[in-house]
Amino acid sequence: LPTARRESSLQTFLPTLNLKYTINDANSIRFSASRTVTRPSFIEMAPFLYQESYGSAQIRGNDELQNGYNYNFDLRYECFGKNGDMISLTGYFKYLDSPIERIQALQGGATLHSFRNADNGMAAGVEVEFRKQLIKDLRLGANLSYMYTNVKLPEGGAYTNKERPLQGASPILANADLTYSPRFGEERQLNLALLYNLQGSRIHAVGVSNLGDIKQQTLHTLNFSAGYDLNRHFSLKLQVNDLLNRNVIFKQEVPSTGTEVEVERYKKGTDFEIGFSYKL
């Protein structure tokens, strides 16, 4: 059988710079800059058709994908209080060289998804985060971010929208967690956590050849975890994912009318994990 071989260089210069200015014991400012690499995954590069666990589209990898390079700049203000309380404000900017995006096309009347490198793109946004102890052993944490993205497409390409947000990037992201962690003696501890996530509408697959972009609609998820340390060695864990079990909904733009139509919806279901661990 014929085989294809693809080699990717691991010799990449990835510098990082971190600076911190301490205003006083409670307040500080941090600045960071870095160059990172996004390498194509095996699934994104494998040149054969496969079916995802969820959804109806078939996917074919692209063995001509190139590494994407990211230039990241972050400025963060932090204020710390008593009992681990904290509030922070972060502004960030990212320049994306050859970002990898998921695209769609029609093949024999069926929808086919694959992957391509865009020319370049950018992302800029702000994030607010806080942690607060409400009462003893009960803590609340949350963060909210807004992000603007834009991508430049190859000249003469078949993309339907010549200017648009970056595929896979949600403009609004929010997370909140409520944790309760009482101790019973020196070794036993209970850990309960309720975790909420909001992911704003985002492009799931980029439209080409007059096909509109497919967008995943805003999604809310709620998870629960519980753990109990019996002693220094033994612990129990329970994880419940997606308590809300909301529909994952996809809508596609219709370029000729400027409207959207629903093309797919499914539920992933609620799943449970129970674990037992032993530490030496």
Regions from the PLM with identified roles:
Residues 60-62, 66, 72, 79, ...:
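Outer membrane beta-barrel strand-and-loop segments of large Gram-negative receptors
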Residues 26-29, 83-87, 137-140, 185-190, ...:
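Repeated loop/turn-to-beta-strand initiation elements of outer-membrane beta-barrel proteins
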Residues 1-96, 179, 195:
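Structural signature of Gram-negative outer-membrane beta-barrels, strongest in the C-terminal barrel
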Residues 13, 21-25, 69, 79-83, ...:
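Outer-membrane beta-barrel strand-turn architecture
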